[in-house]
């Protein structure tokens, strides 16, 4: 199994944890506009939109390999859970899971939880950075996953992606 297959498997796992995106979402001038009312700026340098997933937005890069997603949950019980628990849920499915770092922070004026996790998926060592941001009406999930050997190559893009969050979700 190639690192790309590992990233695809982890991406599918993460996507399965989030709600379905809406068809009215669009991309204009490098910005993703979610039908749920928020926006994020797309990273450059080889990242492409993956269609057909359940997240509002899923991105993949072949070289170096990696995947990231953005999603918002605007109803249901998950809105009541503490941010650290929600961040942990984004990396369910990892075996030999180790939390390397976790921190409570602010993303564009909103409370957030960030966790860096290493583990094994389908026999391959991967790393993930999960960020959960609490908006006025929604929880925003961001996830970046890559083979551990390639993880640092996409981390700056992921952080810029998360920090670009704007708008007031419905």
Question: What is each residue range found by the language model?
Answer:
Residues 23-25:
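Bacterial signal peptide processing site
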């Amino acid at each position: 199994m190639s690192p790309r297959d590992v990233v695809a498997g982890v991406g599918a796992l993460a996507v399965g944890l989030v709600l379905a995106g809406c068809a009215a979402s669009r991309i204009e001038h490098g910005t993703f506009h979610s039908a749920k009312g928020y926006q994020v700026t797309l990273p450059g340098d080889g990242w492409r939109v993956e269609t057909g997933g359940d997240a509002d937005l899923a991105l993949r890069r072949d070289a170096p390999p990696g995947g990231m997603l953005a999603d918002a949950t605007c109803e249901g019980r998950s809105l009541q859970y503490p941010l650290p628990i929600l961040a942990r849920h984004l990396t369910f499915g990892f075996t030999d899971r180790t939390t390397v770092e976790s921190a409570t922070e602010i993303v564009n004026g909103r409370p957030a939880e960030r966790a860096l996790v290493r583990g094994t998926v389908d026999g391959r060592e991967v790393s993930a950075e999960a960020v959960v941001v609490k908006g006025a009406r929604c929880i925003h999930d961001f996830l970046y996953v890559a083979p551990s050997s390639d993880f640092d190559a996409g981390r700056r893009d992921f952080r810029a992606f998360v920090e670009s969050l704007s708008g007031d979700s419905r």
